[in-house]
Amino acid sequence: MLLLLLGILFLHIAVLVLLFVSTIVSQWLVGNGHRTDLWQNCTTSALGAVQHCYSSSVSEWLQSVQATMILSVIFSVLSLFLFFCQLFTLTKGGRFYITGVFQILAGLCVMSAAAIYTVRHSEWHVNNDYSYGFAYILAWVAFPLALLSGIIYVILRKRE
């Protein structure tokens, strides 16, 4: 049981790190001399030094992506806190339903954010000289891992 708890805890912390990095890092779209994330657009010199950064667009779809990414981080942190609370207060044989629900909500939020960004980013960047950055990919990787850990929490029973 201890190994199972350590495994699910490791998976949860990995999801949390993926969510934090994908929300914060400026690598959602990368192209010729520019990087874009949820918060700002940056142009870079040929040597890779940042020359100019300006705030991202105020379009509604981007604000919804920002909000759902923040919600996913909040739900995942709350889920981790609830897991520790339930670990010490739950009766023997009880399930971690609340923890699992919040982790599944975190997964659904990050999936919604990445899907909206995938569909709508072409309105923001009209040229096609870009590719998806590693933060965008980390967001998509966090989605199934968060769902998996949420499902494991729902199935998991507490033992002594």
Curated annotation (Swiss-Prot):
Residues 1, 92-95, 157-160 are cytoplasmic. Keywords: Cell cycle, Cell membrane, Glycoprotein, Growth arrest, Membrane, Transmembrane, Transmembrane helix, Ubl conjugation. It comes from the Eukaryota. One of its GO terms (cellular component) is compact myelin. This is Peripheral myelin protein 22. It comes from Rattus norvegicus (Rat). Ubiquitinated by the DCX(DCAF13) E3 ubiquitin ligase complex, leading to its degradation. InterPro entries: PMP-22/EMP/MP20-like, PMP22, PMP22/EMP/MP20/Claudin, PMP22_EMP_MP20. The keyword DNA-binding does not apply. The lineage of its organism: Eukaryota, Metazoa, Chordata, Craniata, Vertebrata.
